[in-house]
Amino acid sequence: MISKEQKQKIITEFGKNPNDTGSVEVQIALITDRIRYLTEHLKSNKKDHSSKRGLLKLVGQRRSLLRYYQKKNLEAYRTLIAKLGLRK
């Protein structure tokens, strides 16, 4: 799971201030980090179906947030996906 320090690092990197946990950029970055963690977990635990279901829910949540952010601010969306290393 994501540690407190790692979470705070992501918040300071993507947020507007250190207490900015609700902005779209921070939410997408945190979900992306959790998705990366779960994909590594599922590589070694192939039969963990509940984690796989949770991963699919996170991917759907991130997709909807990305769609919203793309409509809201296209340039910031492009820089965000480049920063996170997402394909598109």
From Swiss-Prot:
Pfam families, alphabetized: Ribosomal_S15
Keywords, ordered alphabetically: Ribonucleoprotein, Ribosomal protein, RNA-binding, rRNA-binding
GO molecular function: rRNA binding; structural constituent of ribosome
InterPro entries tied to this protein: Ribosomal_uS15, Ribosomal_uS15_bac-type, uS15_NS1_RNA-bd_sf
BP-aspect Gene Ontology terms: translation
Transmembrane feature ranges: none
GO cellular component terms, A-Z: cytosolic small ribosomal subunit
Key word Ion transport present: no
UniProt keyword Ribonucleoprotein present: yes
Protein family per UniProt: Belongs to the universal ribosomal protein uS15 family.
SUBUNIT field: Part of the 30S ribosomal subunit. Forms a bridge to the 50S subunit in the 70S ribosome, contacting the 23S rRNA.
NCBIfam families: S15_bact (TIGR00952)
HAMAP family for the chain: Ribosomal_uS15_B (MF_01343_B)
Function (record text): One of the primary rRNA binding proteins, it binds directly to 16S rRNA where it helps nucleate assembly of the platform of the 30S subunit by binding and bridging several RNA helices of the 16S rRNA. Forms an intersubunit bridge (bridge B4) with the 23S rRNA of the 50S subunit in the ribosome.
Name of the protein in question: Small ribosomal subunit protein uS15
Organism name: Borrelia hermsii (strain HS1 / DAH)
Protein encoded by which gene: rpsO
